[in-house]
Structure formats: C-alpha cells, structure tokens
Design a protein with these regions (language model features):
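Tryptophan-anchored aromatic micro-motifs
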Residues: 1-14
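N-terminal glycine/threonine-rich, aromatic-flanked beta-hairpin/loop signature
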Residues: 11-49
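Short acidic/polar mixed-charge low-complexity motifs
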Residues: 11-14, 59-61, 78
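A short local loop/turn or secondary-structure capping micro-motif enriched for an aromatic residue
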Residues: 33-36, 61-63, 81-82
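Mid-chain, structured segments of secreted extracytoplasmic proteins
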Residues: 40-68
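Edge beta-strand at a domain terminus
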Residues: 73-83
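Short beta-strand segments that buttress and anchor functional surface loops
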Residues: 6-8, 27-30, 50-57, 74
Length: 83
C-alpha cells in the first residue's frame, strides 16, 4: 500500500498519502522558508488506464510505485522513500 508519509530524496516537499472514504488523497506539504509554516496542498489521486496521477495546475503529476523497493516516484518531483 502506498498510504503513509513519504520523504523526497531530492529535498522536495514531503508527501502524505491517505484514504478518505473510497478515494485516496495526496497532500504535498510545502514549508515556507521565511515563516517555517507548513501549508498542505491536497489532491485526489485519479486513474487514467493503468496510470495514477494528481492534477494540480498547470499539468498532471504521475505517481509510480515500486513495491519491491518501496519507492514512490512523482513525475516532476522525483523519488520518495517511506518515512
């Protein structure tokens, strides 16, 4: 299961994936450099054929998961390891 907290290996924002009713949600936790305040942006995980994605503007971010390595990949943010 990809549910959980994921840390970027490229120092991108932390990602949390969780289930709400019948859908899965992905929150990207942005932390302000100046105020150190965390502000999440939450998106519903959608499916297109066999691909999963979230759709923040301006383009989709595709989600790939390697269960053997337990590595999550977000198309524009790189690899994430389970925290």
């Amino acid at each position: 299961s990809i549910v959980g907290t994921w840390e970027s290996i490229n120092l991108n924002p932390t990602v949390i994936i969780y289930r709400s009713d019948k859908e899965y949600l992905l929150s990207i936790i942005y932390v302000s450099e100046t105020t150190k305040q965390a502000s999440p942006s939450t998106y519903e995980i959608q499916k297109d054929g066999s691909q999963y994605f979230i759709a923040p503007a301006p383009k989709r971010i595709y989600i790939d998961y390697d269960p053997a390595k337990d590595v999550l990949n977000l198309s524009s943010l790189g690899d994430y390891l389970r925290n």
